[in-house]
Each structure stands twice: as C-alpha cells, then as structure tokens.
Amino acid sequence: MAIWQGASRRLSTGAKVWRAAKKHKREMGRPAAETQVSEVIKRKIVRCRGANLKVKLEKTNYANVFDQANNVCKKVAVTKVLDNKANKHYIRRNVMTKGAIIETEMGKAKVTSRPGQDGVVNAVLITE
C-alpha cells in the first residue's frame, strides 16, 4: 500500500472533511531509508520531484568525523550506535539518523547529516 502524505479526512473533533480534490501523485511518500551499520556499503539513487536525484544511504560502516579541537576531518570506521533520540529501537538495530550518537575509532560522535537523504554520514566528535 502506498504512503500518502496529504491532509487527513478528519478534523480534531472527529468531523469528516469532504475532499475538494482527489489524491495527487505529488502527495505520495516513500519508506524511510534506515541507514544501518554494516560492512557492506549500499546506496540507492531515487528520482525526486523536478527530475532531481536523492542518494539514500542504506548501509555503511564509515563516517566523516570532524574534530573541533584540532580543526580536522577524518573518514573513520563506525562500530555501533550508542544512542538515538529518533527511536529507542534504532539503537539495537544500529540505525543512524541525524542526532544519533555513534561509536567510532576516534571516540563518540554525533551525526549531523541526514544519511537517508544526503547519502553520507557526517558527524562531530563529542568531547567529554
């Protein structure tokens, strides 16, 4: 079944709202690309509205980590996801989203990019 992102047919009171127009293709959505920590790197290129392209990162084990103290950015391996505010079950499944805390070779880092939409994992090193 398709994911539809249009307005609901019900008001907050429960009253039914009669549709002024039919459902359009532009209102369709897609399942989220839940980027997982894996040895295999897997990307998916999706055509978006206006013939634009979106790179969805599905699996990876690397991240571009920026160290603010030394002002240097390195590509390092990701071992696991430590915390994810988006969903508590993402921690067990090792799913990375924006704001997730990941364990890397350099230490703990916070993801600043949107891997499911940008196609890359960028993170900032957390100093304690």
UniProtKB/Swiss-Prot annotation:
PROSITE patterns: RIBOSOMAL_S8E. InterPro entries: Ribosomal_eS8 (IPR001047), Ribosomal_eS8_CS (IPR018283), Ribosomal_protein_eS8_arc (IPR020919), Ribosomal_Se8/biogenesis_NSA2 (IPR022309). CDD domains: Ribosomal_S8e (cd11382). The keyword Ribonucleoprotein applies. GO terms for biological process: translation. One of its GO terms (molecular function) is structural constituent of ribosome. GO terms for cellular component: ribonucleoprotein complex; ribosome. Keywords: Ribonucleoprotein, Ribosomal protein. Disulfide bonds: none annotated. Part of the 30S ribosomal subunit. HAMAP family: Ribosomal_eS8. Belongs to the eukaryotic ribosomal protein eS8 family. This is Small ribosomal subunit protein eS8. It comes from Methanococcus maripaludis (strain C5 / ATCC BAA-1333).
